[in-house]
């Protein structure tokens, strides 16, 4: 089995073990979860030590520039005149994702250790924790946009329940606010994903594809497709590629979060249980930044270059706004939330 697949789905295996164990053994749930995260950390370190560097692995728009790749046919539908829809289970890593995999594995171990303080409904908590673990790892390894989107959305449900059920006094408010913010961005991300799918063809099959690596290569866009560079298509009077970049950027900026899309984070940090706060600060915000680098900059590089000043300005505003607000806080978690806004800026 591919080691990335094993890394992603190990939490599912341990989750099934927890699910099958009786409640009388609930004291063992935390040790099982810790073992799962330690195994992931060990595998991440092994992957890092065996990661190859050099000119041959430079770039992002060819599949052979990624490592530990596994590509399997997953969903295949005949859409008649629209052709065949092929969705692949496609995972692999490059220099960006390998660093984040190791960091994520370490943070998950720390979060698992901090879960010792959880006393109620242990089975539910650790099952949701492991589901979140799987989704996070899947995001960093996915090279198929549909698969990426699936893992990206899968993070939302466990986080919603972890905050809403084990959080503080205002946990329901914080959980719903987080859910609505993220859902708003996800709906628009879905629209751009479909547009990209209809714009890109796989040179090997001639069919439309969700393959993110193919989306990063301008040669794979149909001439008159909505996101073709040569097509110069417009949406509401604006260049279609600019609209696509902005919509995806907003979706990921909510997760970063970038000012003024940050207001869900202080509430979520304060109300979330400590293990979830660790994951929010240490992993979730980085996923937003990863999405901007991997997808926004990877698929729409010319738009990112043109708008570099405005992106930089947003970053500076987030840095200063987050820092000054962090200085004014007396609650430690709220201070960490605002400092995270500053750091991500």
Describe the predicted segments one by one.
Residues 52-88, 188-261, 292-310:
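Juxtamembrane/interfacial segments at transmembrane-helix boundaries in multi-pass membrane proteins
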Residues 11, 94, 144-162, 254-301, ...:
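Functional transmembrane alpha-helices
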Residues 2-3, 21-113, 117-127, 209, ...:
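Transmembrane helix-loop-helix hairpins at membrane boundaries of multipass inner-membrane proteins
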Residues 25-26, 131, 135-232, 236, ...:
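Alpha-helical multi-pass transmembrane bundles of energy-transducing inner-membrane proteins
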Residues 2-5, 30, 123, 143-147, ...:
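Residues that define the loop-to-transmembrane-helix transition and helix capping
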Residues 5-20, 35-49, 101-115, 132-134, ...:
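Central hydrophobic cores of alpha-helical transmembrane segments in multi-pass inner-membrane proteins
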Residues 8, 30-33, 101, 126, ...:
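Hydrophobic/aromatic positions within or immediately flanking transmembrane alpha-helices
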Residues 85-92, 107-119, 140, 240-243, ...:
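Short juxtamembrane and helix-loop transition motifs at transmembrane-helix boundaries
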């Amino acid at each position: 089995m591919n080691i990335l697949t094993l890394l992603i789905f190990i939490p599912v295996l341990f989750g099934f073990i927890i699910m099958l164990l009786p409640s009388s053994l609930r004291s063992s749930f935390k040790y099982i979860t810790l073992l799962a995260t330690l195994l992931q950390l060990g595998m991440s370190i092994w992957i890092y030590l065996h990661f190859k560097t050099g000119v041959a692995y430079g770039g992002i728009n060819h599949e052979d520039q990624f490592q530990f790749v596994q590509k399997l046919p997953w969903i295949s539908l005949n859409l008649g005149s629209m052709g065949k829809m092929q969705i692949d289970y496609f995972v692999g890593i490059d220099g960006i994702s390998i660093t984040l995999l190791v960091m994520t594995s370490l943070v998950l171990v720390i979060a698992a250790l901090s879960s010792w303080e959880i006393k109620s409904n242990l089975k539910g908590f650790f099952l949701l924790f492991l589901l979140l673990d799987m989704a996070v790892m899947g995001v960093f390894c996915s090279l198929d946009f549909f698969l990426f989107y699936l893992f990206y959305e899968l993070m939302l449900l466990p986080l919603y329940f972890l905050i809403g059920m084990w959080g503080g006094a205002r946990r329901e408010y914080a959980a719903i606010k987080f859910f609505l913010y993220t859902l708003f961005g996800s709906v628009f991300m879905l629209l751009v994903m479909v547009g990209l799918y209809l714009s890109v063809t796989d040179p090997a099959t001639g069919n439309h594809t969700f393959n993110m690596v193919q989306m990063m290569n301008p040669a794979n866009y149909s001439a008159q497709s909505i996101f073709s560079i040569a097509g110069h298509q417009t949406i509401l009077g604006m260049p279609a590629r600019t609209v696509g970049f902005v919509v995806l950027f907003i979706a990921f900026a909510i997760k970063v979060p970038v000012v003024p899309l940050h207001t869900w984070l202080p509430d979520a940090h304060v109300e979330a249980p400590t293990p979830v706060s660790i994951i929010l600060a240490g992993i979730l915000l980085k996923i937003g930044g990863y999405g901007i680098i991997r997808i926004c900059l990877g698929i729409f590089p010319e738009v990112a270059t043109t708008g570099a000043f405005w992106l930089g300005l947003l970053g500076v505003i987030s840095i200063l706004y987050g820092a000054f607000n962090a200085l004014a806080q007396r609650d430690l978690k709220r201070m960490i939330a605002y400092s995270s806004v500053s750091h991500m800026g």
